[in-house]
């Protein structure tokens, strides 16, 4: 972690979102509200799926895992960002910075792949309804979930081996509100060519495989749905996919825009805004998107409220 007489810094300084004193407290209140909503909605959805037997289906098992990922994702980033609005020095320890970055990488890949698995689940449910119970058993669901963790952890190990070899002699100021790869690479005093190559290769592998899986799944879904004669069945099929497509568009659209743009178009200020969107805003939106028009979730919520009122 050191090169020559270079000593690895014990702390990094995060520049944060803004250095305007007049914006610090308003932004703190806004993002505190967003974080609170994120935790309440995601943890609430996890609890609801856990206690309601009618939601013990593959689709909701995956949704429960998505909510868990979003809750942890937001917790990895937001509390430290909130602290930067209140602190003058805005420091983060070297170990804290590395752990934050690796957690971020792990959760990003996991969510990326989980959205692809959810698309396949919808394909199996709509295109192969008779075989669906045999294709998507609970055992298969949990094996897929464990597989996602394994792939995400593999990506984590690759980035770990690369980042821990970098030295930071010239500067410890990270021009961001959290420890992401681009601002860390910028202040590294050693070559980051291999790190950048690994980010591109593994990022392309996971993101493109996820996008291709989603696109193929939805091509077959659309071809199946247009052949359905019943308007009610057709509406139900489309409605189960709309929320997932919205979540996919938000997450993958932001990731592709950020990490696959030409180098001459890159801007750290623009990168901060896009990072803010998918690390803070999207985890809040996902449970709202999946619950907004979902009759089964609404019915489960009504049952839970009725049960709580009855026993009190």
Swiss-Prot record:
Give the SUPFAM superfamilies listed for this entry: Family A G protein-coupled receptor-like (SSF81321)
- Report the GO molecular function annotations: G protein-coupled receptor activity; odorant binding; olfactory receptor activity
Keyword tags: Cell membrane, Disulfide bond, G-protein coupled receptor, Glycoprotein, Membrane, Olfaction, Receptor, Sensory transduction, Transducer, Transmembrane, Transmembrane helix
Where in the cell? Cell membrane
The membrane topology term of the UniProt record is: Multi-pass membrane protein
Q: Does the keyword Hydrolase apply?
A: no
Which cysteines are cross-linked by disulfides? 97-179
The reply to whether Glycoprotein figures as a keyword in the UniProt entry is yes
| InterPro entries given in the database record | GPCR_Rhodpsn, GPCR_Rhodpsn_7TM, Olfact_rcpt
Extracellular topological domain residue ranges: 1-26, 80-100, 165-205, 261-271
Could you give one GO CC term from the UniProt record?
plasma membrane
Q: Superkingdom, according to UniProt?
A: Eukaryota
Residue intervals on the Cytoplasmic side: 50-57, 121-139, 227-239, 293-312
Sites where a glycan is attached: 5
Provide the transmembrane region boundaries: 27-49, 58-79, 101-120, 140-164, 206-226, 240-260, 272-292
Its family? Belongs to the G-protein coupled receptor 1 family.
Q: What does this protein do?
A: Odorant receptor.
How is this protein named in the record? Olfactory receptor-like protein COR6
Biological source species: Gallus gallus (Chicken)
């Amino acid at each position: 972690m050191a090169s020559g007489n270079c000593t690895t810094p014990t702390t990094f300084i995060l520049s944060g979102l803004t250095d305007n004193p007049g914006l610090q407290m308003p932004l703190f209140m806004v993002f505190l509200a967003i974080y609170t909503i994120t935790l309440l909605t995601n943890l609430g959805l996890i609890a609801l799926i856990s206690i309601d037997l009618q939601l013990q289906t593959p689709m909701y098992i995956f949704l429960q895992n998505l909510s868990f990922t979003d809750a942890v994702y937001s917790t990895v980033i937001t509390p430290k960002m909130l602290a930067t609005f209140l602190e003058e020095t805005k420091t983060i320890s070297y170990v804290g910075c590395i752990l934050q970055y690796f957690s971020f990488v792990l959760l990003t890949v996991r969510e990326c792949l989980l959205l692809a698995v959810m698309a396949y689940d919808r394909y199996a449910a709509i295109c192969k309804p008779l075989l669906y119970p045999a294709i998507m058993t609970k055992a298969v669901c949990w094996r897929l979930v464990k597989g996602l963790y394994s792939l995400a952890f593999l990506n984590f190990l690759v980035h770990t081996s690369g980042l821990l070899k970098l030295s930071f002699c010239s500067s410890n100021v990270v021009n961001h509100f959290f420890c992401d790869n681009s601002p860390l690479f910028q202040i590294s005093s050693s070559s980051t060519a291999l790190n950048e190559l690994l980010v591109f290769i593994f990022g392309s592998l996971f993101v493109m495989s996820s996008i291709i899986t989603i696109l193929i799944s939805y091509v077959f879904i659309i071809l199946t749905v247009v052949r359905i004669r019943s308007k009610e069945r057709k509406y139900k099929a489309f409605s189960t996919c709309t929320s997932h497509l919205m979540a996919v568009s938000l997450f993958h659209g932001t990731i592709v825009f950020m990490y696959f743009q030409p180098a001459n178009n890159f801007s750290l200020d623009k990168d901060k805004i896009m990072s803010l969107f998918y690390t803070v805003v999207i985890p809040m939106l996902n449970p709202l998107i999946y619950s907004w028009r979902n009759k089964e979730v609404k019915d489960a919520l009504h049952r839970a409220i009725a049960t709580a009122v009855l026993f009190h």
